[in-house]
Amino acid sequence: MASLLARRSFSALRARHLAFSGQGLQGSHLCGLQSRAISYGSNKDDEEAEQLAKEISKDWSTVFERSMNTLFLTEMVRGLSLTLKYFFDPKVTINYPFEKGPLSPRFRGEHALRRYPTGEERCIACKLCEAVCPAQAITIEAEEREDGSRRTTRYDIDMTKCIYCGFCQEACPVDAIVEGPNFEFATETHEELLYDKEKLLENGDRWETEIAENLRSESLYR
């Protein structure tokens, strides 16, 4: 009986000792965590303070720079210097429409039907231009004359369909249909861009000098 009581008392003392030692370890662990948290918080506060100081210095430098620009009108002076630079540079533009730049002899502009120097129409109504036109903008009707030659009774071009490819001019065996040098033929209505034979012949008579010169200069390459 005495041995049993001794064992129980020893077990109780051992358990109490373990309990006290566990509380001590737990307390030391908590103290370590608290110290780490305090050190982490202090480091974070230091970083935020340093970042705030940098932003404040940057803001002050920006304010100072803007104040100096406003005081000395640096932006205005910079803009005026650019204006003066281009003011004294040589002109690279022309005063259109009072001045017009050069056109290439191969320029493809408004269509025209040409005549021979005798006044006879060049077109022989072969309809090659009508056949080769990719936009199907040309409509031709013809009949045979008393002398056996064929001439057109109708020659229409829908300028709203034309893509100015120049195939009609290349296909013509007698240089009757050409694309002249005129590029100023804007209209207000659609009907004005539906050219008939009379309109095309009128264009040819008007631009014959320029057209003949362009064809002559390009004759070696055709």
From Swiss-Prot:
Catalyzed reactions per annotation? a ubiquinone + NADH + 5 H(+)(in) = a ubiquinol + NAD(+) + 4 H(+)(out)
Q: What InterPro entries would the database entry show?
A: 4Fe4S_Fe-S-bd, 4Fe4S_Fe_S_CS, NADH_quinone_OxRdtase_chainI
GO molecular function annotation: 4 iron, 4 sulfur cluster binding; metal ion binding; NADH dehydrogenase (ubiquinone) activity
* Location(s), subcellular: Mitochondrion
Q: EC number(s)?
A: 7.1.1.2
What remark does the entry make about the cofactor?
Binds 2 [4Fe-4S] clusters per subunit.
Any idea which positions bind [4Fe-4S] cluster 1? 123, 126, 129, 172
Q: Say yes or no: keyword Hydrolase present.
A: no
Q: What would be one Gene Ontology cellular-component term for the protein? A: membrane
PANTHER family the UniProt entry points to: NADH DEHYDROGENASE [UBIQUINONE] IRON-SULFUR PROTEIN 8, MITOCHONDRIAL, NADH DEHYDROGENASE UBIQUINONE IRON-SULFUR PROTEIN 8, MITOCHONDRIAL
Q: What is the designated name of this protein?
A: NADH dehydrogenase [ubiquinone] iron-sulfur protein 8-B, mitochondrial
